[in-house]
Amino acid sequence: MGFWCRMSENQEQEEVITVRVQDPRVQNEGSWNSYVDYKIFLHTNSKAFTAKTSCVRRRYREFVWLRKQLQRNAGLVPVPELPGKSTFFGTSDEFIEKRRQGLQHFLEKVLQSVVLLSDSQLHLFLQSQLSVPEIEACVQGRSTMTVSDAILRYAMSNCGWAQEERQSSSHLAKGDQPKSCCFLPRSGRRSSPSPPPSEEKDHLEVWAPVVDSEVPSLESPTLPPLSSPLCCDFGRPKEGTSTLQSVRRAVGGDHAVPLDPGQLETVLEK
């Protein structure tokens, strides 16, 4: 997980940027055009960003496009390297985990550069689910939306919230933590317990809701409050999507997705 602080010019507020690349998934599994995409979660109080919290899914091919655009606009400023395209690490799940780590390292370095951070294409890549042609049209003024409009429209969307809430409730019922970093509870309240049968008829008894003593938060207390729930699982088509819940290997708290050896040749180059 990427996390760093930077003092603003007036030294009054510490800028915090948290970025995570995680939850690799195989899209269109079983077809000739299957590929792996990754969840990118970003939370910040930096004024450079339109939305303070965002969550999108991007594939490796889109990272390659982003780096080319950043290099074109950055001039002599060096752009971080991406993980290799055809390097094998023994097993498929190990390869995907190495790639995930490489993509996160790439974004961490990019977001530390003031020059690269000023590129509008980077912001649309991180904070909207626009495709590559749509991003190019937006920054070139060939779209009906401005860059800020596209980011805010995506940030205000609550699509997939009900499904994410149900899944999280199911995990919590089993004593687990929510798996999606984008699930943000609307409040710290749980359902109020029902009164014991012996006291159900006592109308003078008041049952107050139970409030969690610990509210989920990110690493830094300086981060601004999250105003609206976000879920990035709706950015990709639902058809042919596999969450691959079986046998995931945890490395540093993130999860790598195992692939069958037969799938590796069609997936790794995408």
From Swiss-Prot:
Region (Important for membrane trafficking): 135-139
UniProt topology in membrane: Peripheral membrane protein
Swiss-Prot/TrEMBL GO biological process terms: intracellular protein transport; vesicle organization
Region (Disordered): 168-203
Subcellular location as annotated: Cell membrane; Endosome; Cytoplasm
Effect of residue 59 to A: Abolishes lipid-binding
UniProt-recorded name of the protein: Sorting nexin-11
Gene from which this protein is expressed: SNX11
